[in-house]
């Protein structure tokens, strides 16, 4: 059954554990592992019929390598990547690109969540764009304390498996 909720999701330290990245001499990620529970979370959301769009900062080839290696590339309907867009989150252009690629309209914004690990990029960008923000705060690599009201997430989860019941709850509220 097609779900009403639409999921925009970051990659690094949201699905992929950045501490496991191995880069080549050009800085392209050639290997990385998923966060514990992230593979199951992503495949479950995909199998349940959610539209999942990657919205991430980085190099396109890095994402291709990592998701091919982990066998998860098929879970994303589209990928919006900063290298291609020419700007990083929280830029509106990143979210505009994801909307365009998925044929979404202004009216669809109330059905979109952005899941990410960075209050200054993912959460700020989502909040400024007018979509629901979900912070996954498991990683110690970034400061998770909002410095402005616009960096305060709508929801906070601590590990990938906590996303599933939250997504189901938010989707049910749209039914």
Where are these regions (language model features)?
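Conserved phosphoryl-transfer catalytic core
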Residues: 24-28
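Asp-based, Mg2+/Mn2+-dependent phosphohydrolase catalytic module
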Residues: 1-20, 31-46, 50-175
């Amino acid at each position: 059954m097609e779900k009403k909720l639409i999921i925009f999701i970051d990659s690094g330290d949201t699905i992929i554990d950045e501490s496991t990245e191995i880069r080549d001499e050009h800085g392209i990620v050639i290997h990385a592992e998923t966060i514990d529970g992230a593979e199951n979370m992503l495949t479950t959301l995909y199998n349940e019929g959610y539209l999942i769009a990657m919205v991430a900062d980085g190099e396109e080839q890095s994402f291709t390598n990592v998701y091919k290696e982990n066998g998860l590339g098929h879970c994303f309907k589209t990928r919006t990547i900063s290298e291609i867009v020419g700007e990083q989150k929280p830029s509106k252009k990143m979210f505009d690109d994801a909307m365009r690629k998925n044929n979404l309209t202004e009216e669809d914004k109330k059905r979109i969540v952005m899941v990410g690990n960075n209050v200054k990029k993912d959460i700020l960008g989502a909040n400024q764009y007018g979509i629901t923000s979900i912070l996954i705060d498991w990683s110690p690599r970034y400061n998770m304390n909002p410095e402005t009201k616009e960096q305060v997430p709508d929801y906070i989860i601590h590990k990938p498996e906590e996303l599933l019941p939250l997504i189901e709850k938010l989707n049910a509220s749209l039914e």
